[in-house]
């Protein structure tokens, strides 16, 4: 029972070197080493007890603190008590085992960060009215082709036809003189007799027609311009009639002497041979050009 008594006399946590199985054969010689081991173990236990024991709940990065939703009220008060005492003494102090800057960080509410318009949080925070309003077709920034369900092109703008610009006359322009039928016949008869009137003749003729000299003068000027245009048109027509008609060779059609009949005879000779028994002599045919009249000449006389 001696080994059992030695084990109970040692304090808790001391490693026992001597046991019932490892005790040396000599009983008296083994008593001194066991007493020295007991004193060394007691001193180690005192040193460990002198060290401050930190509860794992005070550490913010411990497993218990990470798994728990919030700290215990007691732990919070015990962690804040040393810091309040240190502030009252005049110097900043932190609780033992807590890293600097981590005190009160989990409990202090973090300042809300501004959410962007295109971030996930910003889109989730937007109300439904804002989303519906953004998608509504009444938004002025949207183009007409985006409002259409089929993305049809915008309708073409109807451009009003340009206004017809009329020729602007002078403001002091005199109105056109309405000549009567008798006056026109008398003016035309006088123009055939003489195209240019002298000053005396124009004064006498205008008084007989109850017209002014300026009206008679302008009418004769216009009538001479009209006669000149008609004369130029007649000359152009005579020039066109005097030009000879182009011969058929100009159009790529050339006939040999004898006309189309000679062409047919030559084709038959080449087909049957020159010495064929059924060959017939072709009658001479007068050229077609001898019987054709000049087209321009006939047109000139018809006009």
From Swiss-Prot:
Residues 133-142 have a biased composition (Basic and acidic residues). SUPFAM superfamilies: Homeodomain-like (SSF46689). There is a cross-link at residues 15, 133 (Glycyl lysine isopeptide (Lys-Gly) (interchain with G-Cter in SUMO)). Keywords: Developmental protein, DNA-binding, Homeobox, Isopeptide bond, Nucleus, Repressor, Transcription, Transcription regulation, Ubl conjugation. Residues 172-231 bind DNA. SMART domains: HOX. One of its GO terms (molecular function) is DNA-binding transcription repressor activity, RNA polymerase II-specific. The keyword Transcription applies. It is found in: Nucleus. GO terms for biological process: activation of meiosis; anterior/posterior pattern specification; BMP signaling pathway; bone morphogenesis; cartilage morphogenesis; cell morphogenesis; cell surface receptor signaling pathway involved in heart development; embryonic forelimb morphogenesis. Sumoylated by PIAS1, desumoylated by SENP1. Sumoylation of Lys-15 and Lys-133 not required for interaction with H1-5, transcriptional repression, inhibition of myoblast differentiation, or binding to gene promoters. The keyword Transferase does not apply. Residues 18-56, 69-120, 133-163 are annotated as: Disordered. Residues 31-44, 81-101 have a biased composition (Low complexity). One of its GO terms (cellular component) is nucleus. InterPro entries: HD (IPR001356), HD_metazoa (IPR020479), Homeobox_CS (IPR017970), Homeodomain-like_sf (IPR009057), Msh_Homeobox_Regulators (IPR050674). Interacts with CREBBP/CBP, TBP and SP1; interaction with these transcription activators may inhibit autoinactivation. Interacts (via C-terminus) with PIAS1 (via N-terminus); the interaction is required for the localization of both proteins to the nuclear periphery and specific binding of MSX1 to the core enhancer region in target gene promoters. Interacts with H1-5. Acts as a transcriptional repressor. Capable of transcription autoinactivation. Binds to the consensus sequence 5'-C/GTAAT-3' in downstream activin regulatory elements (DARE) in the gene promoter, thereby repressing the transcription of CGA/alpha-GSU and GNRHR. Represses transcription of myoblast differentiation factors. Binds to core enhancer regions in target gene promoters of myoblast differentiation factors with binding specificity facilitated by interaction with PIAS1. Belongs to the Msh homeobox family. This is Homeobox protein MSX-1.
């Amino acid at each position: 029972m001696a080994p059992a008594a030695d084990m109970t006399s040692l304090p808790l946590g001391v490693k026992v070197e001597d046991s019932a199985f490892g005790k040396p054969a000599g009983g008296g010689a083994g008593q001194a080493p066991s007493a020295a081991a007991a004193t060394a173990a007691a001193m180690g236990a005192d040193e460990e007890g002198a060290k401050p024991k930190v509860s794992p709940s005070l550490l913010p990065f411990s497993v218990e603190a990470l798994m728990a939703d919030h700290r215990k009220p007691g732990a919070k008060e015990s962690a804040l008590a040393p810091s309040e005492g240190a502030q009252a003494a005049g110097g900043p102090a932190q609780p033992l085992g807590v890293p600097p800057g981590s005190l009160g960080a989990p409990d202090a509410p973090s300042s809300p960060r501004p959410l962007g318009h295109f971030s996930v949080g910003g889109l989730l925070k937007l109300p439904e009215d804002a989303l519906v309003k953004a998608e509504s077709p009444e938004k002025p920034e949207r183009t007409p082709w985006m409002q259409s369900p089929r993305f049809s092109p915008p309708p073409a703008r109807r451009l009003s036809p340009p206004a017809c610009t009329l020729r602007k006359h002078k403001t002091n322009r005199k109105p056109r003189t309405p000549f009567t039928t008798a006056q026109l016949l008398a003016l035309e008869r006088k123009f055939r007799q003489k195209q240019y009137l002298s000053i005396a003749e124009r004064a006498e003729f205008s008084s007989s027609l109850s017209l002014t000299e300026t009206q008679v003068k302008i009418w004769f000027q216009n009538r001479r311009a009209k006669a000149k245009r008609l004369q130029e048109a007649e000359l152009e027509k005579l020039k066109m009639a005097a030009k000879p008609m182009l011969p058929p060779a100009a159009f790529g059609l050339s006939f040999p002497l004898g006309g189309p009949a000679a062409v047919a005879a030559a084709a038959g000779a080449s087909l049957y041979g020159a010495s064929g028994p059924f060959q017939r002599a072709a009658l001479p045919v007068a050229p077609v050009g001898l019987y054709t009249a000049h087209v321009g000449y006939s047109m000139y006389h018809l006009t």
